[in-house]
Amino acid sequence: MKARAAIRTRQQAEVVNQQNRKNDDDEKFTHALGQIEDYSVSIRLGRGKYSNVFRGHQKDGSLCVVKVLKPVKISKINREIKILEDLRGGPYISQLLDVVRDKDTKSIALILDWADNVKITSTFYSLTVKDIAIYMYKVLKALEFAHSKGIMHRDIKPGNIMYSPETNSVHVIDWGLAEFYNPGTSYPVRVATRHYKGPELLLNFTQYNCSLDIWCLGCTLAGILFQKVPFFKGSDNDDQILKMGEIFGGNKIIAYAEKYNLRLSQKLQATLCNYQGKTWSSYVKRDNKKVATPEALDLLSKMLTIDHNERPTATQALNHPFFNIIRNEV
């Protein structure tokens, strides 16, 4: 496991050296603006802390996504645009088409390509193991590309994966929380959605890396396989840790905290000591046994490894035998 972590660290360091970028360049970044008149908006698709998202149309009538950014530091806007530019051409990743500014409100809007979407929870009982393999494979290909660029998504979850069951099309969207990775750098832990947060975030480990995305995607896979979204549903961060303890055993959480010198309250430790853990096979029931195959459970167990440095990289996950059934079809 130490060798795997060392390889990952070297690879990520090489990526950063090749990119030769500095975070403080964000304030200097400027982007050529397109013509806002070239686009129109119709219905609102969603709203978030940092943006409102609309269905839009381009001049030729084709659909697009219009993401209107709320007023935030210019560095955050610049970073999101820079990341989307670096991701341009990447597989199964939402593509930046244009950047425009409203003349009256001065708001910046990102124009992104359109992707059809059906909530994954509405497809549970129709998904085959091949459907799930294709879904996971495409998201991992997107992450492999992003990580090769030194970019962490930091908010992988079903809501940020556009999926069409008719065509098995997949688009990883919403790179607003994404960040460039620099080995040894401390990052804020208030990223990702609680039910998909890795233990490193919940225990305030700030020097996390791209393996966070692997955990988040593992949570997504667990929800799909066992038809329970979200799979880890804690009421707060401490309860989220306890939900993990119920599955993995409390001692694994405690050992992880001790290894990285992370703080666990006495109350939390006392409760975790009562959890012996469960096997993934114990979640296999009549309704899900056709998709929760031994290969799927093995991939899941590797992605949902408590120690962030022992999780597979996206490339390693893509080489898992689970994908042999679709490897020549994607």
Which residue stretches match the model-derived regions?
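Conserved short submotifs of the Hanks-type protein kinase catalytic core
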Residues: 105-118
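Catalytic-loop of the protein kinase fold
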Residues: 147-163
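Conserved HxN/HPN-centered segment at the entrance to the catalytic loop
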Residues: 89-99
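C-terminal lobe substrate-recognition/regulatory segment of protein kinase catalytic domains
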Residues: 250-301
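Glycine-rich ATP phosphate-binding loop
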Residues: 52-70
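Activation segment signature within eukaryotic-like protein kinase domains
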Residues: 135-136
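Protein kinase glycine-rich loop
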Residues: 42-48, 53
